Regions:
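Hydrophobic core segments of alpha-helical transmembrane domains in multi-pass membrane transport
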Residues: 18-19, 43-47, 104-108, 142-154, ...
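Membrane-interfacial amphipathic/re-entrant helices at transmembrane-helix boundaries
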Residues: 1-18, 31, 45, 54-65
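Short, non-helical or kinked segments that cap or interrupt transmembrane helices
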Residues: 24-45, 86-99, 164, 209-223, ...
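Helix-loop-helix "hairpin" substructures at the membrane interface of multi-pass membrane proteins
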Residues: 137-213, 236, 241
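Alpha-helical transmembrane segments within multi-pass membrane transporters and channels
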Residues: 57-102, 147
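Cytosolic-side transmembrane-helix boundaries in multi-pass membrane proteins
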Residues: 152, 170-184, 257-305
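Transmembrane helix-bundle core of multi-pass membrane transporters
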Residues: 92, 103-158, 259-270, 297-305
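Transmembrane alpha-helical segments in multi-pass inner-membrane proteins
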Residues: 212-276
Length: 305
């Protein structure tokens, strides 16, 4: 049971962070399909920072600097999507897909450049990111994720910034008519998405293991986070619940060998497929009631009203 709780929290926080990132982007009117790639970029930036920091540095500084590095890398990478979608008015789905493909290639090149073996694997120490409560090992991303969840809710619903952001995703022409700079708000939404997605990527890669092969990217976690965002109806606390729901399915592959599930003698691939199958089934039944921002995916042209 402790193992199930451990992995559910581990994966649930990852999915929640990335889905919250997608939520900010889509509330501004930009569909961020590039979450998968942003996770990879955040992961490789965080791991690289972790390996380059001097030995003996305090664990708090290690955690702080690596998370900041990941968030900054994610924001910089998300600027590519923002520029293509907002300034060039490119198709957001195609642009995001291209960035997903590019991210893995970039991560592999970087990893091979810093790997002693010349492979795409990087070794690192993840001990600063782990702590125990009553025999339950958790990562620092669990409390950080809860804090960011609360902050996201407050920012989105209790601040002028959040009101303006949502206005740009619902009716950008009306927002512009009252003096809101739609372009700046959409850039802000995508940048927030990049930061949260990158932190989520680092949370996915660093705590569970001490070696990561960047050729596998993040194994579809970014796309699963998109399903979490849709199932959560673009609302922070709904997203948290949806993330934990999908995380239970994703956790089964990690605990199958040590629980009664081992008696079924199923391949781990079956358990790895479960969250994706569940997402398709759930979205098939709930997509009709979707409350997506009305202007998401539609390039804004100030001259057309």
């Amino acid at each position: 049971m402790l193992l199930l709780i451990k992995y559910t929290l581990l994966y649930g926080i990852v999915l929640m962070l990335v889905a919250l990132g997608g939520m900010f982007s889509e509330h501004s009117g930009i569909i961020n399909i590039a979450l998968e790639g942003i996770m990879v970029i955040g992961g490789v930036a965080g791991v690289l920072t972790l390996t380059l920091l001097p030995a003996g540095m305090s664990p708090f500084l290690v955690v702080l600097l690596t998370i900041l590095a990941a968030a900054l890398a994610g924001m910089v990478y998300s600027l590519l999507l923002a520029f293509a979608s907002i300034n060039l008015k490119a198709d957001q789905t195609i642009g995001g897909t291209a960035l997903n493909l590019l991210a893995t290639a970039i991560a592999v090149v970087i990893a091979k450049s810093f790997s002693d073996s010349g492979s795409a694997k990087l070794n690192y120490c993840n001990k600063p990111f782990l702590f125990s409560i009553g025999g339950l090992e958790l990562s620092v991303f669990v409390p950080l994720g809860i804090i960011l969840l609360i902050i996201s809710y407050v920012v989105l619903y209790k601040t002028r910034f959040g009101l303006r952001l949502r206005a740009c995703g619902e009716h950008p022409q009306a927002a512009d008519s009252v003096g809101i700079n739609v372009y700046k708000m959409r850039y802000a939404g995508v940048l927030l998405s990049g930061a949260l997605g990158a932190i989520g990527g680092m949370a996915y890669i660093v705590p569970p293991v001490q070696t990561w092969n960047f050729e596998v990217g993040v194994a579809g976690a970014g796309f699963l986070a998109l399903a979490v965002m849709i199932f959560g109806q673009w609302k922070p606390f709904n997203i948290f619940g949806a993330a934990m729901f999908f995380a239970v399915f994703k956790s089964l592959a990690n605990i199958a060998d040590s629980t009664f599930l081992a008696q079924l003698h199923w391949s781990s691939n079956i358990y790895n497929m479960m969250p994706f199958v569940a997402s398709m089934v759930i979205l098939a039944f709930t997509s009709k009631n979707s409350m997506a921002p009305k202007a998401e995916g539609i390039p804004y042209d100030k001259g057309s009203r």
